[in-house]
Curated annotation (Swiss-Prot):
This is Sec-independent protein translocase protein TatA. GO terms for cellular component: TAT protein transport complex. It comes from the Bacteria. It comes from Dehalococcoides mccartyi (strain ATCC BAA-2266 / KCTC 15142 / 195). The gene is tatA. One of its GO terms (molecular function) is protein transmembrane transporter activity. Residues 43-65 are annotated as: Disordered.
């Protein structure tokens, strides 16, 4: 399996910036993060527990704003 070094990571980041643009990077990062989180939940079987916690966190954030 090939190793991914700093130059390869830099090239990937530059390609992502070129394809999506600076303005969309937060949205893309959020979507990737949610996808990884959902994958981990599904693999560990804690999906239902996390949904309840996420809803509670959302309510807390909405109240603080």
């Amino acid at each position: 399996m090939p190793k991914i070094g700093p130059m390869e990571i830099l090239i990937i980041v530059l390609l992502v910036v070129v394809v999506f643009g600076i303005g969309k990077l937060p949205q893309v990062g959020d979507a990737i993060g949610k996808g990884i989180r959902n994958f981990r939940k599904a693999s560990s079987g804690e999906e239902e527990k996390e949904e309840v916690e996420t809803k509670e966190e959302t309510k807390t954030i909405e109240k603080s704003e």
